[in-house]
Amino acid sequence: MPIITDVYAREVLDSRGNPTVEVEVLTESGAFGRALVPSGASTGEYEAVELRDGDKDRYLGKGVTKAVENVNEKIAPEIVEGEFSVLDQVSIDKMMIQLDGTENKGKLGANAILGVSIAVARAAADLLGQPLYKYLGGFNGKQLPVPMMNIVNGGSHSDAPIAFQEFMILPVGADSFKESLRWGAEIFHNLAKILKKRGLETAVGDEGGFAPKFHGTEDAVDTILEAIKAVGLEPGKDVYLGFDIASSEFYENGVYDYTKFEGPEGAKRTSAEQVDYLEELVNKYPIITIEDGMDENDWDGWKQLTDRLGKKVQLVGDDLFVTNTKKLSEGIEKGIGNSILIKVNQIGTLTETFDAIQMAQKAGYTAVISHRSGETEDTTIADIAVATNAGQIKTGSLSRTDRIAKYNQLLRIEDELYETAEFDGIHSFYNLDK
């Protein structure tokens, strides 16, 4: 029977050693689902609220016992006493949103609500004897995503003196996800060799990328290109580059202040100068995607950037859209960006996540399914990427088990789909003139 009989949450740890929420759901028939909730380092101003305890004597204030209690004492009784079916995802998500009653899920916490939402979906898939991607996407879910691999970390994700938060490689020329993953791994290991030869640090950051002290942004890019060529691959054909600039992290009083991360030698740029700078980089290097190139509140700057580069570069809104259909709808209407980053914990339920993906795809925007810097062994985002035919996934570098877990899940899915599996490579960027 599909009736949910038990919902239970506990406090566990994420990849940074910080507490997070784990939720388990059980049905009458014994079907079971478990979900772990991720957490971000750089967060958008308009994201749903991640409820933390604030008790400085426990986990430095980062405990999540309040969120756990909200699941066990408030959400669980509503679900169990209401005799909800595990197959009724939309009704359960809607009930939790109403129970919270706030615009940003600040009462119960998005980390509490999301844990339940995903655990319910996993239990439903278990009940039906289906893999999660098939339960979520039906027979249409068969496209494996191009991995956006963050192999060099800067900004808030490392101590490297570089403002840009992520430098990514995208192996679009591969014939399969399996081959794209191999290319990425070989580039990653060749990059490590190059860094060691230069006497640079090869310790990895939150998302598994290297965080050496490069001589600025272009030094980082040139070194990555060297690693790509060392594998025998061609930049701009086999492999493209991407940036997550996370510009909201260094935007203040109308100025993009690179000195925050790069020291006194860093530039200070107006919105127009920021657009000019990004265009210079695009003209010089094989860049196919730029995330958060402008601040989340600099909509005029975003419009300038979109008008200038929107036909040839994927312009991804992360802090800009925060997986929120209201924000995305406004962006579509104003012609801002051409892609949305999808982070399940930015909005807090699977239903709202899928609504955002569908809205983007209907408008001709791409949807990039994404991890957070504080991750867990949970692989739900891999299944979401295939279920929605998103075509792109951003889940870190080629190290750290919390990142590799998602890649390994995608390998399993590709194997299971066998001849029906699709990998569209460069054609996943249907929002660009190629």
UniProtKB/Swiss-Prot annotation:
Pathway: Carbohydrate degradation; glycolysis; pyruvate from D-glyceraldehyde 3-phosphate: step 4/5. GO terms for biological process: glycolytic process. The active site is at 207 (proton donor), 343 (proton acceptor). Mg(2+) binds at residues 244, 291, 318. It is found in: Cytoplasm; Secreted; Cell surface. It holds the Pfam family Enolase_C. InterPro entries: Enolase, Enolase-like_C_sf, Enolase-like_N, Enolase_C, Enolase_CS, Enolase_N. One of its GO terms (cellular component) is cell surface. Belongs to the enolase family. Catalyzes the reversible conversion of 2-phosphoglycerate (2-PG) into phosphoenolpyruvate (PEP). It is essential for the degradation of carbohydrates via glycolysis. This is Enolase. The gene is eno.
